[in-house]
Curated annotation (Swiss-Prot):
Its EC number is 3.4.21.-. The keyword Thylakoid does not apply. This is Thrombin-like enzyme 1. It is an enzyme of class 3 (hydrolase). GO terms for molecular function: serine-type endopeptidase activity; toxin activity. The keyword NADP does not apply. Pfam families: Trypsin. It is found in: Secreted. Its main location: secreted. One of its GO terms (cellular component) is secretory granule. The lineage of its organism: Eukaryota, Metazoa, Chordata, Craniata, Vertebrata. Belongs to the peptidase S1 family. Snake venom subfamily. Expressed by the venom gland.
């Protein structure tokens, strides 16, 4: 009975979201130069390698994925084209990194989130501004925006100079669990993608934003390989479920009470 329900959900969602395919560009398009002022790039200090994306949420904090952690990193803000520098680009280093350690009612799938306090505040500018945290959870069926400098081919890796942007659909979590049975029955992650395939986040997009209704609703977490397969959406850490933790740390309370 459960399998029938999941298959029915997949069919209904595939048919309903097919109607929205005209809103999407296969594989994503180059982001508009003014639409990603909050998008940051994480680099390894020693190798200079691009690691992950992240999101500026205020002048002093960046939100990204915990699996993007490396001992020595720097954060680049205001970048569009890796080979063309803007006058207002800024570089910062982590002053402190915070990881979500709560265990009550949270599985390992729910904890891929890292809050970075920058070594000094960022100045808002033409190409730098924070993105709002969510005021409410996103609704299934929402069309959301993803972006990043991650690979644009899979399984072989091709990294672009300019970030790519695409629209994907927020799906019911049961869709992801139907495709990936090892997922827990309940999760505080978001399931999102395009069931027809061809559009997806991929390697090195990790840590970047899932934006729904102009708010940061998700952090790029995990997806199948190769990327962008039909009927195989990806998982995003649900920011709304970590909101109290984030806001408490920003307010100076680093011994945060875990949410229920």
């Amino acid at each position: 009975m459960v399998l029938i329900t999941v298959l029915a959900n997949l069919l209904i969602l595939q048919l309903s979201y097919a109607q929205k395919s005209s809103e999407l560009v296969i594989g994503g398009d180059e982001c508009n130069i003014n639409e990603h002022r909050f998008l940051v790039a994480l680099y390894d200090v020693w190798s200079g390698d691009f690691l992950c994306g992240g999101t500026l949420i205020n002048k002093e904090y960046v939100l990204t994925a915990a699996h993007c952690e490396t001992r020595n990193m720097y954060i680049y803000l205001g970048m569009h084209n890796k080979n063309v520098q803007f006058d207002d680009e800024q570089r910062r280093y982590p002053k402190k990194k915070y990881f979500f350690r709560c265990s009550n009612n949270f599985t390992r799938w729910d904890k891929d989130i890292m809050l970075i306090r920058l070594n000094r505040p960022v100045r808002n500018s033409e190409h730098i501004a924070p993105l709002s945290l969510p005021s409410s959870p996103p609704s299934v069926g929402s069309v959301c925006r993803v972006m990043g400098w991650g690979t644009i081919t899979s399984p072989n890796e091709t990294l672009p100079d300019v970030p790519r942007c695409a629209n994907i659909n927020l799906l019911n979590y049961t869709v992801c669990r139907g495709v990936f049975p090892r997922l827990p029955a309940r999760s505080r992650t978001l399931c999102a993608g395009v069931l027809q395939g061809g559009i997806d986040t991929c390697k090195r997009d990790s840590g970047g934003p899932l934006i729904c209704n102009g708010q940061l609703q998700g952090v790029v977490f995990w997806g199948p390989k190769p990327c962008a397969q039909p009927r195989k959406p990806a998982l995003y850490t649900k920011v709304f479920n970590h909101l109290d933790w984030i806001q408490s740390i920003i307010a100076g309370n680093t011994t945060v009470t875990c949410p229920p």
